[in-house]
Amino acid sequence: QRGYQWEDTIVKRFKKTENWKAFRLGSPSIALPDVLAVNTKQSTIFTIEAKSGTSTSLPVPADQIERCLEWIKTFDIYKNKQVLLAFKFLSKKRIDVGVYKNRELREFFKIWDETLEITDCVCTYDGKIYSKINGERKELDLKECKMPFKTKQRTSA
């Protein structure tokens, strides 16, 4: 449910932005990115994997990154093609079952680096991204995407 709302929010923000179109692509049972956003004037396409939650870290499985990459590769007519990992840390942090603590709502839109090996990865509340290989975490230097709409992105952590 939360994931759906976050995807819906992203789509609505793009739709309110001039020259952008965005769509939710489907259910979790189908191997599609969560959101597809295009700007034909700027020849730009984003495939977006959206994650939201109340924990201190949000994981993205490797296969979800892979399917986003597969999708943008099929749209070779676009000059700018990027996979974005969109993270929303809700303003309530879950401490225990049914127990929450207030915190700042944070959003991060990270650009997947296509030169990297595709791995499971995780984004932390401070906006750092780590790959997870055989249980070991390694920090990844993924750039923050400047979105064409207003966000709760932090310019510096």
Where are these regions (language model features)?
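Short, solvent-exposed loop/turn segments that connect beta-strands within catalytic domains
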Residues: 40-44, 77-80, 92-95
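Acidic-basic catalytic patches of nuclease active cores, encompassing PD-(D/E)XK
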Residues: 1-26
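Conserved catalytic cores of phosphodiester-cleaving nucleases, focusing on short active-site segments
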Residues: 14, 35-37, 44-54
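Short acidic/glycine-enriched loop/turn segments that link adjacent beta-strands
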Residues: 29-32
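Domain-level recognition of nuclease-like catalytic cores that cleave nucleotide substrates
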Residues: 1, 82-157
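Acidic-residue sensor for enzyme active/binding pockets
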Residues: 7, 49, 64
